[in-house]
Amino acid sequence: MMSCFQKKSIATAEKLAEIKIVPVLVLNSVEEGLKVGEILVSEGLLAAEITFRTVAAESVIKAMSEKFPELYIGAGTVLNTDDLKRAFDAGAKFAVAPGFNPTVVKSAIENSYSFAPGICTPSEVEQAYELGCKFLKFFPAEAAGGISMLKSVIAPYKHLGIRFMPTGGVSEANANDYLSIPEVAAVGGTWLGKPTDIVEENWDAIREKVRQAVFNSRK
């Protein structure tokens, strides 16, 4: 029988599979978050991963969740149980991490949070699966060997129904190649909202990248 944690994680994978591309965002203020949120909603890309790499992350998640309820907002770079709780208290629908931390996974299970730990080896897949994880972040995707490595990691576990979200080096050029893998639910991408573009308020550049990503994902 599936746990509530597993059901929520599978639901997240299925929801993100509809959206396909998840912008990975480093935001320094609520104002930045609301502007990027407006762009995402207007262009029809209804997901975002707000990374806990800045002190503003929690308030950004809260503000964006309230302003744009249609956005499926998650928290990224969740490295400890405190950030995990803060993310969901702020309104995050899911959370992901770059690595596999059993303590954080167990906290997610206990609290029925939708959480995808990061993996890049078969050993990590097995450890995550043993704890009940059904949705995993493959990170750092390109540096770890890219599409061929991900396919090799997936191969022994196809029968388990695990879904993956590759992130790290995913770009406009290779996103659809990753998405062509049946076990890949979605890809995470920093190219859609580069920190420099956000800080310099290059909103038109971000809008064009988002628009192109939506177009490409529908091919």
Regions found by a protein language model. Name each.
Residues 103-105, 109-144:
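Histidine/lysine/aspartate-rich catalytic loop segments that bind and position anionic ligands
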Residues 1-90, 110, 180, 200-218:
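Conserved N-terminal beta1-alpha1 strand-loop-helix module at the mouth
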